[in-house]
Amino acid sequence: MARVKGGTVTRKRRKKVLKLAKGYYGSKHTLFKSAKEQVMNSYYYAFRDRRQKKRDFRKLWIARINAAARMNGLSYSKLMHGLKLAEIDINRKMLADLAVNDAAAFTALAEQAKDALSK
């Protein structure tokens, strides 16, 4: 049986990894072994952080809503409960946007939440 030389396949595989490692610091973009390890870690970080991003944004929105709610004399949890009782269905992303960009509209929502809580 003849010997199979895998030069082209190996070269293509290595070039593919080194192309993915373009822009990495130090030997991580030139040496195949360290580039391969870094690319694998990069995929791991990307996968993990796509999920982390959702948590981070939710935390940011809640912090913004809480700050604006306290300026209107409510805590975050009281505001959310009041909005639910008033049957105002608005998500946290939109509430946070209102809190930052349209304080008057947020204040109106906070007043409706207060009214619903007092009933």
Swiss-Prot record:
One of its GO terms (cellular component) is ribosome. It holds the Pfam family Ribosomal_L20. Gene3D superfamilies: 6.10.160.10, Ribosomal protein L20 (1.10.1900.20). One of its GO terms (molecular function) is structural constituent of ribosome. The keyword RNA-binding applies. InterPro entries: Ribosomal_bL20 (IPR005813), RIBOSOMAL_L20_CS (IPR049946), Ribosomal_protein_bL20_C (IPR035566). Keywords: Ribonucleoprotein, Ribosomal protein, RNA-binding, rRNA-binding. The keyword DNA damage does not apply. SUPFAM superfamilies: Ribosomal protein L20. It comes from the Bacteria. NCBIfam families: rplT_bact (TIGR01032). Belongs to the bacterial ribosomal protein bL20 family. This is Large ribosomal subunit protein bL20. The gene is rplT.
